[in-house]
């Protein structure tokens, strides 16, 4: 029992809390962006895809460094957030959530968009013929049909957010009890030979 008492659970709790909130944000943002992409022309859709999928091709540490540049207290956005909302992103738990969300978001977006593209347009036309609004068609026709793809995107997003290391370590750091997630803590233990 002494072994169990010596285990610090804060990295696990911080990781779970971060991953859950990042997944919720990516879920709604990914579905909204995927729905918007459905309505765009091919060139505009390609540009949007390139921008939203950028975190997939960037190394996570580079994504974290870019977030650090944007949200630093020496940059306009960081200054604005601090002066108006007392929100500090760098070296804080909101930084963990932001890093995990940015890195995991493309997985939700890609899965939602692929699921929406698989929906038969005849269902949408039938809903319009019945006089349903676009929102009602989306909510009662498109979402249920695309449900399995959205569910798989949600699972992938959660898993990616839970295991995020690179961007989190760059933006939020490694503060025990505050920003040390499981991935960041495991890296520290392997470097300090605490295993």
Indicate residue ranges for each PLM-predicted region.
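Feature of multi-pass inner-membrane transport and sensor proteins
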Residues: 136, 172, 177-179
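Short hydrophobic, aromatic-rich alpha-helical segments embedded in or entering the lipid bilayer
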Residues: 176-190
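Canonical alpha-helical transmembrane segment with a positive-inside/aromatic-interface signature
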Residues: 128, 137-138
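Basic (Lys/Arg-enriched) interaction patch that binds polyanionic ligands
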Residues: 132-133, 140
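A membrane-interface signal for the N-terminal entry of alpha-helical transmembrane segments
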Residues: 193-195
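Membrane-water interface segments at the C-terminal ends of transmembrane alpha-helices
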Residues: 2, 6-117, 141-166, 170, ...
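Transmembrane helix boundary and interhelical loop/hinge segments in multi-pass membrane proteins
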Residues: 111-125, 134, 147, 182
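Glycine/proline-centered hinge or cleavage motifs at structural transition points of membrane proteins
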Residues: 130-131, 144
């Amino acid at each position: 029992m002494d072994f169990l008492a010596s285990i610090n659970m804060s990295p696990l709790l911080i990781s779970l809390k971060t991953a859950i909130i990042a997944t919720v944000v990516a879920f709604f943002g990914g579905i909204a962006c995927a729905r918007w992409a459905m309505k765009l022309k091919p060139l505009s859709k390609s540009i949007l895809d390139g921008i939203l999928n950028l975190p997939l091709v960037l190394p996570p540490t580079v994504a974290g460094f870019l977030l650090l540049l944007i949200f630093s207290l020496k940059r306009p956005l960081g200054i604005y957030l601090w002066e108006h909302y007392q929100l500090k992103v760098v070296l804080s738990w909101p930084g963990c959530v932001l890093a995990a969300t940015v890195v995991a978001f493309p997985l939700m977006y890609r899965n939602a968009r692929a699921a929406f593209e698989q929906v038969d347009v005849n269902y949408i036309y039938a809903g319009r013929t019945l006089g349903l609004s676009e929102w009602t068609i989306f909510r009662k026709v498109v979402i249920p049909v695309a449900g399995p793809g959205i569910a798989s995107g949600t699972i992938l997003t959660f898993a990616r957010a839970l295991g995020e290391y690179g961007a989190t370590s760059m933006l939020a750091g490694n503060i025990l009890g505050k920003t040390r997630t499981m991935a960041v803590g495991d890296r520290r233990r392997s470097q300090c030979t605490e295993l």
